[in-house]
């Protein structure tokens, strides 16, 4: 091998290593099923990937529906009557619909139904409605949920990978959130 070719190979390898060090992640074929809080890809095939400025423009124009998929620990069933249970507070992008637990890689039938029904309500049944899916930064939950939304046939899906972390860093408003009720919620 000539010195020139060897030099080019070394230079190419030097460029690849920093990309990995910066957290560059390959978009998987399926859904992510572990390490949900870790670096995410820069892409999602079929979806628009939004910056904070782009998400803000959509929010201010009210041209899309924002869907938060951050998980939430459920209240354990069968707690003694006097047990105090406090849900962890969630602040999300004002006007969002919160569909917790819908970003896992594998969804139980009831959770998948909850997501489908939530998307149908959010979109008004319009499969072309702009749906902006988010969670936190470096959160695969939003990536999975956006990918699943595309698989359900929605055609205008945007993924906001910075989520409420990026939103708050930009000093944009947040609001106290409550999840959309599930059919099996205690009354």
Task: Give the ranges of each region predicted by the language model.
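Rhodanese-like catalytic fold shared by cysteine-dependent sulfurtransferases
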Residues: 17-53, 58-61, 77-132, 137-187
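Positively charged n-region of N-terminal signal peptides that target proteins for export
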Residues: 1-4
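Bacterial N-terminal signal peptides
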Residues: 6-17
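Short hydrophobic beta-strand that contains or immediately precedes a catalytic carboxylate
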Residues: 55, 65-70
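Surface-exposed acidic loop/strand-edge motifs in secreted or periplasmic proteins
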Residues: 69-73, 78
């Amino acid at each position: 091998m000539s010195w020139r070719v060897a030099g080019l190979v070394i230079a190419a390898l030097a460029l690849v290593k920093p990309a990995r060090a910066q957290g560059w992640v390959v978009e998987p074929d399926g859904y992510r099923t572990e390490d949900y809080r870790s670096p995410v890809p820069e892409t999602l095939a079929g979806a628009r990937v939004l910056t904070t400025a782009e998400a803000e423009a959509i929010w201010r124009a009210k041209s899309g529906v924002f869907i938060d998929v951050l998980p939430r620990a459920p209240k354990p069933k069968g707690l003694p009557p006097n047990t105090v249970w406090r849900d962890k507070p969630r602040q999300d992008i004002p006007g969002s619909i919160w569909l917790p637990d819908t970003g896992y890689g594998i969804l139980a039938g009831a959770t998948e139904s909850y997501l489908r029904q939530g998307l149908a309500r959010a979109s008004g049944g319009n499969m072309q409605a702009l749906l902006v899916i988010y969670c936190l930064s470096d959160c695969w939950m939003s990536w999975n949920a956006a990918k699943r939304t595309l698989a359900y046939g929605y055609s205008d899906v945007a993924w906001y990978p910075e989520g409420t972390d990026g939103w708050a860093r930009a000093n944009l408003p947040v609001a106290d959130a409550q999840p959309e009720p599930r059919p099996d919620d205690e009354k």
